[in-house]
Amino acid sequence: MKKSKIIEALIRQAEADKSKALMALDLLENQAVGIGDHTANDFFKDANEALDLLTDADDKLETLNKYWGDQPLPF
């Protein structure tokens, strides 16, 4: 059964959040020289925020797949 538009939108949002978090972590890890005004505390704060976003996105994708993977909608 095809997923509803709301479930598809939730999946797309979680995928976008995951990509954004991975990009931020990659920039902080590999291209930090280009980010001028950051202190060590700023880098850690930004990395922690990106990790939180990544964890949240992965959790959402796992939950959406668990309940709306290849199965019919539960309601």
Region annotations inferred by a language model:
Residues 2-75:
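Extended, charge-rich alpha-helical interface modules
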